[in-house]
């Protein structure tokens, strides 16, 4: 699938992020599971990423880390 571009607002500033549809679906599901909006979760991820990593990559890594932790918790 081709990446889809969506606008997010991070601490009052608009930005666009391109992610594959599957990542947008997982990102929405993670935010909903935490009772948070996409903008809030994206702002947290943005604040924690290093300058060497773009926001889209940071979101993908966050999703992967969360899914890995959930899988490991079930396997215990």
Name the predicted role of every residue range.
Residues 5, 9-63:
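Amphipathic, hydrophobic secondary-structure cores in small proteins
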Residues 60-76:
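Short, solvent-exposed charged binding patches
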């Amino acid at each position: 699938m081709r990446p889809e571009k969506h606008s997010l607002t991070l601490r009052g500033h608009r930005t666009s992020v391109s992610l594959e549809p599957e990542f947008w679906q997982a990102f929405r599901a993670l935010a909903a599971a935490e009772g948070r909006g996409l903008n809030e979760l994206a702002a947290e991820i943005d604040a924690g990423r290093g300058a060497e990593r773009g926001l889209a990559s940071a979101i993908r890594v966050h999703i992967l880390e969360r899914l890995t932790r959930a899988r490991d918790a079930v396997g215990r």
